[in-house]
């Protein structure tokens, strides 16, 4: 696939699975734009925008942001992008979001190319999230409001309840493949690439 062709990759997996890290590397190595709704929303919160003030309590509680807000953010990000070469990290999270994204991508002539699902045991996920917060604090950086054990466990539960239909959706379309998300960054990355072939 050349860099002038459309490529749409959707990373799935629970919070703390390493989606952001792996998506960043894949984006850099394959000239893709990484779209993280979480990063976009956190930026709005940090800047104190109207949207940021609207979603801050939702994010702090570990709940999912309403679909209409996320779809509008994605539509805005993809406007004018040709070819469409993107990685979605943290979106879609529900079947309704997947259907809305598919409709948007269909309008752009850029169907989903691959959907790697990173699988990591729950306790490993919790440990990673708490450690991420500890490391940020040790470096004197701002700690994400959701990088604590209680919120992390709630996010895992929300993920399981709301994302399973999404996994079924992409599996049914033959676009999903499972990746063992435990191991070194290079090991996991190599598994992702192998699954995309």
UniProtKB/Swiss-Prot annotation:
Sequence positions that bind AMP: 37, 42, 63-65, 90-93, 97, 144, 155
Catalytic activities: AMP + ATP = 2 ADP
Top-rank lineage group of the source organism: Bacteria
UniProt cross-references to InterPro entries, sorted A to Z: Adenyl_kin_sub, Adenylat/UMP-CMP_kin, Adenylat_kinase_CS, P-loop_NTPase
Binding annotation for ATP: 16-21, 132, 183
Subcellular location: Cytoplasm
Spans annotated as LID: 131-147
Single Gene Ontology BP annotation: AMP salvage
Major location (coarse): cytoplasm
EC number: 2.7.4.3
Keyword line: ATP-binding, Cytoplasm, Kinase, Nucleotide biosynthesis, Nucleotide-binding, Transferase
Region feature NMP, mapped onto this chain: 36-65
MF term (GO), any: ATP binding
Pathway the protein contributes to: Purine metabolism; AMP biosynthesis via salvage pathway; AMP from ADP: step 1/1
GO CC term (a single one): cytoplasm
Annotated domain remarks: Consists of three domains, a large central CORE domain and two small peripheral domains, NMPbind and LID, which undergo movements during catalysis. The LID domain closes over the site of phosphoryl transfer upon ATP binding. Assembling and dissambling the active center during each catalytic cycle provides an effective means to prevent ATP hydrolysis.
Quaternary structure note: Monomer.
NCBIfam families from the UniProt entry: adk, PRK00279.1-3, PRK14527.1, PRK14531.1, PRK14532.1
The family this protein is said to belong to: Belongs to the adenylate kinase family.
Function: Catalyzes the reversible transfer of the terminal phosphate group between ATP and AMP. Plays an important role in cellular energy homeostasis and in adenine nucleotide metabolism.
Name of the protein described by the UniProt record: Adenylate kinase
